[in-house]
């Protein structure tokens, strides 16, 4: 159900963005995170997938921090588009 809601956004992203761009990678990681989160509602003790989720969260966080340092405008636009929280500043 989560996968179907992102199909129009994916098609727009593929036309406009390079698959290697930071925005596209963050978008794909966010998709995976949402799919895994819905998976954990049924399979609470799937610890291997929980580890994978933590790894994906870390990768997305590193990409977002890179983007926020390089271009704040693109970072804010991406955060609003994906409806995710802004990272805390250390």
From Swiss-Prot:
Gene Ontology terms: biological process: translation
GO cellular component, one term: ribosome
Domain of life, source organism: Eukaryota
Localization of this protein: Plastid, Chloroplast
GO molecular function, one term: structural constituent of ribosome
Transmembrane segments: none
Any Pfam family matching the protein: Ribosomal_S15
Keyword terms of this UniProt record: Chloroplast, Plastid, Ribonucleoprotein, Ribosomal protein
SUPFAM superfamilies (alphabetical): S15/NS1 RNA-binding domain
Quaternary context: Part of the 30S ribosomal subunit.
Family: Belongs to the universal ribosomal protein uS15 family.
PANTHER family in the record: RIBOSOMAL PROTEIN S15, BACTERIAL AND ORGANELLAR, SMALL RIBOSOMAL SUBUNIT PROTEIN US15M
Name of the protein in its database record: Small ribosomal subunit protein uS15c
UniProt organism field: Lotus japonicus
Species classification: Eukaryota, Viridiplantae, Streptophyta, Embryophyta, Tracheophyta
